[in-house]
Protein backbone atom coordinates (compact mmCIF):
# COMPACT_ATOMS: atom_id res chain seq x y z
CA UNK A 1 0.00 0.00 0.00
CA UNK A 2 1.45 3.36 -0.95
CA UNK A 3 1.76 6.29 1.43
CA UNK A 4 -0.85 8.39 -0.39
CA UNK A 5 -3.48 5.63 -0.04
CA UNK A 6 -2.59 5.16 3.63
CA UNK A 7 -3.20 8.85 4.29
CA UNK A 8 -6.64 8.56 2.67
CA UNK A 9 -7.50 5.83 5.17
CA UNK A 10 -5.85 7.47 8.19
CA UNK A 11 -7.54 10.86 7.90
CA UNK A 12 -11.13 9.62 8.39
CA UNK A 13 -10.04 7.29 11.19
CA UNK A 14 -8.21 10.07 13.01
CA UNK A 15 -11.26 12.31 12.59
CA UNK A 16 -13.45 9.65 14.22
CA UNK A 17 -11.04 9.18 17.11
CA UNK A 18 -10.69 12.92 17.72
CA UNK A 19 -14.43 13.67 17.57
CA UNK A 20 -16.27 10.53 18.66
CA UNK A 21 -14.08 8.86 21.29
CA UNK A 22 -14.72 10.18 24.78
CA UNK A 23 -13.16 9.44 28.15
CA UNK A 24 -14.97 7.09 30.52
CA UNK A 25 -14.26 6.34 34.16
CA UNK A 26 -14.50 2.65 34.92
CA UNK A 27 -16.11 -0.11 32.90
CA UNK A 28 -18.32 1.23 30.14
CA UNK A 29 -21.28 -1.11 30.75
CA UNK A 30 -22.23 0.33 34.17
CA UNK A 31 -21.30 3.81 32.99
CA UNK A 32 -23.64 3.50 30.01
CA UNK A 33 -26.50 2.60 32.35
CA UNK A 34 -25.63 5.55 34.62
CA UNK A 35 -25.66 7.82 31.57
CA UNK A 36 -29.03 6.44 30.44
CA UNK A 37 -30.48 6.97 33.93
CA UNK A 38 -29.09 10.49 34.10
CA UNK A 39 -30.55 11.35 30.71
CA UNK A 40 -33.94 9.91 31.65
CA UNK A 41 -33.93 11.86 34.95
CA UNK A 42 -33.05 15.04 33.06
CA UNK A 43 -36.05 14.69 30.76
CA UNK A 44 -38.34 13.60 33.58
CA UNK A 45 -37.66 16.92 35.29
CA UNK A 46 -37.71 15.51 38.81
CA UNK A 47 -36.00 12.84 40.87
CA UNK A 48 -37.46 9.49 39.89
CA UNK A 49 -38.83 7.35 42.69
CA UNK A 50 -37.72 4.19 40.94
CA UNK A 51 -35.56 3.16 38.00
CA UNK A 52 -36.42 0.14 35.91
CA UNK A 53 -33.75 -0.72 33.37
CA UNK A 54 -33.94 -3.32 30.63
CA UNK A 55 -30.51 -4.21 29.31
CA UNK A 56 -29.11 -6.64 26.78
CA UNK A 57 -27.78 -10.00 27.98
CA UNK A 58 -24.29 -8.84 27.01
CA UNK A 59 -24.51 -5.65 29.09
CA UNK A 60 -25.90 -7.70 31.99
CA UNK A 61 -23.07 -10.24 31.75
CA UNK A 62 -20.36 -7.60 31.54
CA UNK A 63 -21.77 -5.20 34.11
CA UNK A 64 -23.10 -7.21 37.02
CA UNK A 65 -19.78 -7.92 38.72
CA UNK A 66 -18.01 -4.68 37.88
CA UNK A 67 -17.05 -2.27 40.65
CA UNK A 68 -18.54 1.19 40.22
CA UNK A 69 -15.75 3.74 40.80
CA UNK A 70 -15.96 5.72 44.02
CA UNK A 71 -18.72 3.58 45.55
CA UNK A 72 -17.07 0.43 46.84
CA UNK A 73 -20.05 -1.38 45.33
CA UNK A 74 -20.53 -3.60 42.29
CA UNK A 75 -23.23 -4.07 39.72
CA UNK A 76 -25.73 -2.41 37.49
CA UNK A 77 -28.29 -1.38 40.14
CA UNK A 78 -25.88 1.07 41.80
CA UNK A 79 -24.78 2.33 38.39
CA UNK A 80 -28.40 3.01 37.43
CA UNK A 81 -28.97 4.89 40.69
CA UNK A 82 -25.91 7.14 40.39
CA UNK A 83 -27.64 10.19 38.94
CA UNK A 84 -30.58 9.98 41.29
CA UNK A 85 -28.28 9.81 44.30
CA UNK A 86 -25.74 12.40 43.24
CA UNK A 87 -27.81 15.27 41.80
CA UNK A 88 -24.86 16.12 39.56
CA UNK A 89 -24.73 17.62 36.13
CA UNK A 90 -24.48 15.22 33.24
CA UNK A 91 -20.90 14.92 32.02
CA UNK A 92 -21.22 12.23 29.36
CA UNK A 93 -19.42 9.02 30.37
CA UNK A 94 -17.60 10.68 33.28
CA UNK A 95 -20.83 11.03 35.26
CA UNK A 96 -19.64 8.70 38.01
CA UNK A 97 -16.45 10.71 38.54
CA UNK A 98 -18.44 13.58 40.04
CA UNK A 99 -20.45 11.54 42.54
CA UNK A 100 -20.12 12.79 46.09
CA UNK A 101 -18.63 10.15 48.40
CA UNK A 102 -20.99 11.05 51.25
CA UNK A 103 -24.00 10.18 49.13
CA UNK A 104 -22.55 6.77 48.29
CA UNK A 105 -21.86 5.99 51.95
CA UNK A 106 -25.53 6.51 52.78
CA UNK A 107 -26.80 4.04 50.17
CA UNK A 108 -28.51 1.00 51.60
CA UNK A 109 -27.80 -2.01 49.42
CA UNK A 110 -31.14 -3.58 50.30
CA UNK A 111 -32.87 -0.72 48.45
CA UNK A 112 -31.12 -1.65 45.21
CA UNK A 113 -33.27 -4.24 43.47
CA UNK A 114 -31.82 -6.92 41.29
CA UNK A 115 -32.22 -6.26 37.58
UniProtKB/Swiss-Prot annotation:
Source organism, top-level taxon: Bacteria
InterPro entries the UniProt entry points to: UPF0597
Family stated for the protein in its record: Belongs to the UPF0597 family.
Name the record gives this protein: UPF0597 protein HI_0855
Organism the protein comes from: Haemophilus influenzae (strain ATCC 51907 / DSM 11121 / KW20 / Rd)
